[in-house]
Each structure stands twice: as structure tokens, then as C-alpha cells.
UniProtKB/Swiss-Prot annotation:
Protein name in UniProt: 2,3-bisphosphoglycerate-dependent phosphoglycerate mutase
Binding positions (substrate): 9-16, 22-23, 61, 88-91, 99, 115-116, 159-160
Species classification: Bacteria, Pseudomonadati, Pseudomonadota, Alphaproteobacteria, Hyphomicrobiales
Active site annotation, chain numbering: H10 (tele-phosphohistidine intermediate), E88 (proton donor/acceptor)
Pfam families tied to this protein: His_Phos_1
Length: 208
């Protein structure tokens, strides 16, 4: 029985382009982001991958990425569940600020700690630890059981919400996970064993 789980970070958003902290704010994809999402769908199609269900966040950039991937796969009507449990990390008072402006205001070292530490939240926001505590229970309750039943699952979400899943799947530590880069529009294809450990992982980048 195939136990397929594909993780895809949304394509470039308007605020990614402007170098703004986004979090739970809701900008749309750029033209580049749309192209990235479509390319992700084509790479999945070239691998013969199809899905039984899709999970995404409550934010437009992830939902549009999911829809564009599924359109490229010829599955535009696939059941899709959107839940804020899969939302990006909440950047609190940093949300909407240019990252360079934030460094000028608080200092580059402090902003680096907020961005890349595991358990230090920005003012009014979530740490990566907080995000993991939000994402993992939902995943264990709603997503993983479907994968283990043999359903082929797509999760289109965000850099930090997906880091929570990759941390568990890849067995990464709280020291290494904050520095993990997940590229926009690049699917990670996991196949799991019966004990939920990873049988194989493939990164479908531009050369896949």
C-alpha cells in the first residue's frame, strides 16, 4: 500500500517580493508565484502523482497554490480542506514590516533571533515552537491517519508550518530546524512505512 504525503510551500507572494514579514496577513501570489505553483503541479504530474485529498491553510497564497497544482494535475475538483492550524507562523508586531526596517528598529541580532531561534517569539507573535505546537496535533489527528490508510495527500502551506512537519518526518532537532530552507513552489514527496517512518523522500526542484 502506498502511503504518499506531498508537502508544498506556496509560490512567491506579493509580500515575499516586497521583503515584508507576512505571517497571518493575506497577500496573494505574484505572477512568479503563480508560475511556481503551476510548475510544481507539472513536476508532480511528470512523476505520475495524483491525490485523493488536499489540505491547506486559511490563507489565500496557500489555497491558490493548492488550486493551481491540482489544476495542472487535472484534479481541480479534488476535496480540499482549509484550516488555520496550517497557517504560517504569526509574526505579531513584525507583520507587515519590511525586514530591513525591522532590523533598523530592533537591531539585526534581535530580528535574527526572532526569525531563526526555535522558542523566542517576536512581540505579540509565535515562536517556531508555538507553530509546531499548533500544526502537529492537527496533522496527527487529521492528516497522518489518512496517509496511513493509503490516501494520497497533498499539503500546501507555508515555510514555518511545513517546517513543523519536516522536523518530525526527517527527525531534525530543535537546533537545526529553524535554519531549514523550504523553497517556494518546490514539492517534497514523502513515502511512509507502516510504522510512519520515512521510506523515501524526493525534492522535486527545477531539475527533477
Amino acid at each position: 500500500m502506498e502511503r504518499l504525503l506531498v508537502l508544498a510551500r506556496h509560490g512567491q507572494s506579493e509580500w515575499n517580493l516586497k521583503n515584508l514579514f507576512t505571517g497571518w496577513r493575506d497577500p496573494d501570489l505574484t505572477e512568479v508565484g503563480i508560475a511556481e505553483a503551476r510548475a510544481a503541479g507539472r513536476r508532480l504530474k511528470a512523476k505520475g502523482i495524483r491525490f485523493d485529498i488536499c489540505f491547506t491553510s486559511a490563507l489565500t497564497r496557500a489555497q491558490r497554490t493548492a488550486a493551481l497544482i491540482l489544476e495542472e494535475l487535472g484534479q481541480p475538483d479534488l476535496p480540499t480542506i482549509a484550516d488555520e492550524a496550517l497557517n504560517e507562523r504569526d509574526y505579531g508586531d513584525l507583520s507587515g514590516l519590511n525586514k530591513d526596517d525591522a532590523r533598523a528598529r530592533w537591531g539585526k541580532d534581535q530580528v535574527h533571533i526572532w526569525r531563526r531561534s526555535y522558542d523566542v517569539p517576536p512581540p505579540g507573535g509565535e515562536s517556531l515552537k508555538d507553530t509546531v505546537a499548533r500544526v502537529l496535533p492537527y496533522t496527527m489527528r487529521e492528516i497522518l491517519p489518512r496517509v496511513m490508510r493509503g490516501e494520497r495527500v497533498l499539503v500546501a502551506a507555508h515555510g514555518n508550518s511545513l517546517r513543523a512537519l519536516v522536523m518530525v518526518l526527517d527527525g531534525l532537532t530543535t537546533e537545526t530546524i529553524p535554519g531549514l530552507e523550504l523553497w517556494t513552489g518546490v514539492p517534497l514527496v514523502y513515502r511512509l512505512k507502516a510504522d510512519t517512518t520515512v521510506e523515501s523522500k524526493e525534492v522535486l526542484d527545477k531539475d527533477a
